[in-house]
Amino acid sequence: MKYNSSGAMCASPGGDQPDKHKQPKNGQQPPDKQPKNGQKQPKKQRHTKRFTAQEEALRVEAIVDAKERDMAARGRCERCWHNARDGHCICAHLEALRFRLDVRFVLYTHHKEYYCAGDDAKVLAAVAPDAAEVFVYGRRGDDARLGAILRGPCAERRCLLLFPDDGAATVDSFFAAPGAAPVPARGAAAGAPFYVVVVDATWTLARKMARHLDRLLGGALPHVKLETDVVSVYARTQSKTGRVCTVEAVALFLREVGESDELFRKMVAMVETNNRALKHEYAKRRADLWASGPTMGNPAWYYAMRVDEGVS
């Protein structure tokens, strides 16, 4: 017998024995290759090119350099990443933030989000340049700088990663743990700021980046999740529950640790300002920006509730 194109057995001139040298096209195993004793059928191997750390760093740097050249060619603003040439720059509508708390933000960004106008984390860096800095995952030198900045605060529990994995602590339980340092007020005598790390990427990539941060810092970076009933105003709705954008996550964390409601509202308003620019700049692609589906790629994935426009 032989297998036809549909995987069924058909008559063979050579007799009734299965052809052991030809695999069925639909991926099924021939009878003599079927797993026995309830064993699972082996998965088809995916062949993906693996880069060395140096090759990956060079690849990411080339991607970032190409994006920077494209930004200049298209007339995009280097601060808000919107098209300034066509009048969509939002910098004039962004109010500088003044924090009561002495906090620093590390925006660990995937190169796919870097220089993407729809990304919201860049707005935080634009309005608080002294308190927020963008680091690109995989770019040469960024990991070394990141490690140098965070190792001390991690050792003193003055640092956390907003990341809602299974082992993440709540904000209350993190600060209630022995040795945890409270978020100091700006200008306090101690003079040691508190660091908040956020991963700016799609959920699949964010998990990989979070694991990389754990390796970089020897597992010393605590993971913390938020508990809130506020829903997202982010421009792109999510395919899964538990998603709001980076700026909203930071705003809600700050409110939980004592920042003012006024600053919270200003940060949410920044996301809305970014949304309005997207609605004009990408009017032809609006369906893509607002569609919800299993392949939607954006970094708004922080919470466990249904995501919709508006704030409750």
Language-model features: where?
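Glycine-rich, flexible N-terminal cofactor/catalytic loop recognition
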Residues: 67-68, 83-156, 181-186
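C-terminal folded domains that constitute the principal catalytic or ligand-binding module
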Residues: 189, 195-196, 201-312
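Intrinsically disordered, low-complexity repeat/linker tracts enriched for polar/charged residues
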Residues: 16-23, 28-34, 39-45
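Short cysteine-rich clusters marking metal-coordination/redox-active sites
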Residues: 77-80
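Short, acidic/turn-prone active-site loops that include or flank metal/cofactor-
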Residues: 111-112, 139, 166-167, 226-231
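S-adenosyl-L-methionine/SAH cofactor-binding core of RNA-modifying enzymes
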Residues: 127-215
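Short Cys/His-rich Zn2+-coordinating modules
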Residues: 51-71
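N-terminal chloroplast transit peptides
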Residues: 1, 8-11
